[in-house]
Amino acid sequence: MKRVAILGSTGSIGVQALDVVGRFPDRFEVVGLAAGRNAPRLLEQIRRFRPRVVSVCDEAAARAVRAEAPPGTEVLSGDAGAVAVASHPDAAFVLAAISGGAGLRSTAAAIEAGKPVGLANKESMVLAGELLMARAAAKGVAILPVDSEHSAIHQSLVGHNRGEVRRLILTASGGPLRCTPEAELATVTPERALKHPNWSMGDKITIDSATLMNKGLEVIEARWLFGVEQQRIDIVVHPESVVHSMVEYVDGSIVAQLGISDMRGPISYAMGHPERMPLDLPPLDLGRLGKLTFEPPDPARFPAYTLAYRALELGGTAPAVLSGADEAAVAAFLARRCSFTEIAEVCADVLEAHVVEPVRSVEQALAASEHGRREAEKRVGARAHAPASR
C-alpha cells in the first residue's frame, strides 16, 4: 500500500490522479490533499478518500471546508498548509500538480522531506529546475515526470545509457490554431483558443498550447529533468498526439512512447513506478488511425516557444521571469485585455529587459516570477492605452 499526497487535487491532473487511486484501492491510500478554492469538490474528495490532512489556498475556504469535513481530517490553509501536506510524515509519494508558480514551495518541501515526487507542475522546473534537481540528488529523491511528453522521454530512456543520447524530441499537437493563417491570429478569441483538439486541460495550459509557449516551457523542464542541453532538445508538431515524445540515440535510432491522449496513463506510470498498472482505457488502434504526421513548428506564427530557448541561453532568473510574464499575459488575453499575438510580444519585451541573476533559493525564483508578472501587466496596460496607429 503506497500512501500518497496529492497537491492540486481539485484541478484537472488531481482529479484524474484520484480516479487512478480509486481504481486501485488495494495499492494506494490518500493521506493528504491540497487544493485551491473549490471547497465543494474538495469535500467530495475528503468524503471518498478520508485523508488525514487537507489544505486550501486561504482561510475563508478553510472555514467552509472545516464546517462540513468529517471528523479526523485536519484542515489547513495557505502556502504553509500545502507545504505541510507535501511534507507529511505518512506520505510515501507526492503528486505535485498545483498549477503555476504557486506550486513551487510545496514541490520543494516534498523534495526536502525526502519524498519521491510525481511532477505535473512544470513551472517548478521552469522557475528553479537546476536548484530542485540539485536538492533531489542530495536527498536521493526520485522525480518522476507526469507531463505526457516528459513521461514519454522517461519511458524511452529506460534501459539505455544516458551518455548515448543524441537529442530529445518533444512532440506538440500544434494546438487549436495550428492551421490558422498568420493574418488571423491577432483576432483569435479566447473561446476559439480554448478548443484544444486532443487534450482536456485547464484554461492557462490550453492557451499555452495554442501559442506553443507550453512546448517552450517543456523544453526548459526537459533541460533540467534529464540533464540535456537545450541545443539537443527539439520540437516537432504532431497533430495526432499519439507519439508523446522521442529520444534519438547516437547510432541514429529513435525510441518513442505512443499511446492514446489520456493523462491517466502518465499519472499511473509515475504513481506506480517501477511497476505498471492495468488501466481500462481504449487501446491505441494504429490500423484504424492509418497514419502519423509530423511537421516543424512555425516560429513566424508561433514565436512563443523560441523565448524558452532564449531564456535558457540567458540563464539564471530568466526562465522564471518568462514564466511569470506568460501567466500575466495569458490572464490578460482570457480577460480580453490583450490580443492572442500580444502574449508572445509582451513576454519577449519582459524577457529582454530583465537583468539576469543566479537562482540561489526558491524565494528568489518566486520573486523573479512575480517580477515578470508585474512587468507584463505594466506592458499590457501600456498597450491598451497606447494611441492607435494611423
Curated annotation (Swiss-Prot):
<dbReference type="InterPro" id="IPR013512">
    <property type="entry name" value="DXP_reductoisomerase_N"/>
</dbReference>
<feature type="binding site">
    <location>
        <position position="122"/>
    </location>
    <ligand>
        <name>1-deoxy-D-xylulose 5-phosphate</name>
    </ligand>
</feature>
<feature type="binding site">
    <location>
        <position position="37"/>
    </location>
    <ligand>
        <name>NADPH</name>
    </ligand>
</feature>
<comment type="pathway">
    <text>Isoprenoid biosynthesis; isopentenyl diphosphate biosynthesis via DXP pathway; isopentenyl diphosphate from 1-deoxy-D-xylulose 5-phosphate: step 1/6.</text>
</comment>
<feature type="binding site">
    <location>
        <position position="10"/>
    </location>
    <ligand>
        <name>NADPH</name>
    </ligand>
</feature>
<feature type="binding site">
    <location>
        <position position="149"/>
    </location>
    <ligand>
        <name>Mn(2+)</name>
    </ligand>
</feature>
<feature type="binding site">
    <location>
        <position position="11"/>
    </location>
    <ligand>
        <name>NADPH</name>
    </ligand>
</feature>
<feature type="binding site">
    <location>
        <position position="148"/>
    </location>
    <ligand>
        <name>1-deoxy-D-xylulose 5-phosphate</name>
    </ligand>
</feature>
<feature type="binding site">
    <location>
        <position position="121"/>
    </location>
    <ligand>
        <name>NADPH</name>
    </ligand>
</feature>
<feature type="binding site">
    <location>
        <position position="149"/>
    </location>
    <ligand>
        <name>1-deoxy-D-xylulose 5-phosphate</name>
    </ligand>
</feature>
<dbReference type="InterPro" id="IPR036169">
    <property type="entry name" value="DXPR_C_sf"/>
</dbReference>
<keyword id="KW-0479">Metal-binding</keyword>
<feature type="binding site">
    <location>
        <position position="13"/>
    </location>
    <ligand>
        <name>NADPH</name>
    </ligand>
</feature>
<feature type="binding site">
    <location>
        <position position="215"/>
    </location>
    <ligand>
        <name>1-deoxy-D-xylulose 5-phosphate</name>
    </ligand>
</feature>
<comment type="similarity">
    <text>Belongs to the DXR family.</text>
</comment>
<feature type="binding site">
    <location>
        <position position="196"/>
    </location>
    <ligand>
        <name>1-deoxy-D-xylulose 5-phosphate</name>
    </ligand>
</feature>
<dbReference type="GO" id="GO:0070402">
    <property type="term" value="F:NADPH binding"/>
</dbReference>
<keyword id="KW-0560">Oxidoreductase</keyword>
<feature type="binding site">
    <location>
        <position position="214"/>
    </location>
    <ligand>
        <name>1-deoxy-D-xylulose 5-phosphate</name>
    </ligand>
</feature>
<dbReference type="InterPro" id="IPR026877">
    <property type="entry name" value="DXPR_C"/>
</dbReference>
<dbReference type="GO" id="GO:0030604">
    <property type="term" value="F:1-deoxy-D-xylulose-5-phosphate reductoisomerase activity"/>
</dbReference>
<feature type="binding site">
    <location>
        <position position="147"/>
    </location>
    <ligand>
        <name>Mn(2+)</name>
    </ligand>
</feature>
<dbReference type="GO" id="GO:0030145">
    <property type="term" value="F:manganese ion binding"/>
</dbReference>
<feature type="region of interest" description="Disordered">
    <location>
        <begin position="367"/>
        <end position="390"/>
    </location>
</feature>
<comment type="function">
    <text>Catalyzes the NADPH-dependent rearrangement and reduction of 1-deoxy-D-xylulose-5-phosphate (DXP) to 2-C-methyl-D-erythritol 4-phosphate (MEP).</text>
</comment>
<feature type="binding site">
    <location>
        <position position="209"/>
    </location>
    <ligand>
        <name>1-deoxy-D-xylulose 5-phosphate</name>
    </ligand>
</feature>
<feature type="compositionally biased region" description="Basic and acidic residues">
    <location>
        <begin position="370"/>
        <end position="380"/>
    </location>
</feature>
<protein>
    <recommendedName>
        <fullName>1-deoxy-D-xylulose 5-phosphate reductoisomerase</fullName>
        <ecNumber>1.1.1.267</ecNumber>
    </recommendedName>
</protein>
<dbReference type="Pfam" id="PF02670">
    <property type="entry name" value="DXP_reductoisom"/>
</dbReference>
<keyword id="KW-0521">NADP</keyword>
<dbReference type="GO" id="GO:0051484">
    <property type="term" value="P:isopentenyl diphosphate biosynthetic process, methylerythritol 4-phosphate pathway involved in terpenoid biosynthetic process"/>
</dbReference>
<feature type="binding site">
    <location>
        <position position="36"/>
    </location>
    <ligand>
        <name>NADPH</name>
    </ligand>
</feature>
<feature type="binding site">
    <location>
        <position position="123"/>
    </location>
    <ligand>
        <name>NADPH</name>
    </ligand>
</feature>
<dbReference type="InterPro" id="IPR036291">
    <property type="entry name" value="NAD(P)-bd_dom_sf"/>
</dbReference>
<dbReference type="InterPro" id="IPR003821">
    <property type="entry name" value="DXP_reductoisomerase"/>
</dbReference>
<dbReference type="Pfam" id="PF13288">
    <property type="entry name" value="DXPR_C"/>
</dbReference>
<keyword id="KW-0464">Manganese</keyword>
<feature type="binding site">
    <location>
        <position position="173"/>
    </location>
    <ligand>
        <name>1-deoxy-D-xylulose 5-phosphate</name>
    </ligand>
</feature>
<feature type="binding site">
    <location>
        <position position="38"/>
    </location>
    <ligand>
        <name>NADPH</name>
    </ligand>
</feature>
<feature type="binding site">
    <location>
        <position position="218"/>
    </location>
    <ligand>
        <name>1-deoxy-D-xylulose 5-phosphate</name>
    </ligand>
</feature>
<dbReference type="Pfam" id="PF08436">
    <property type="entry name" value="DXP_redisom_C"/>
</dbReference>
<feature type="binding site">
    <location>
        <position position="218"/>
    </location>
    <ligand>
        <name>Mn(2+)</name>
    </ligand>
</feature>
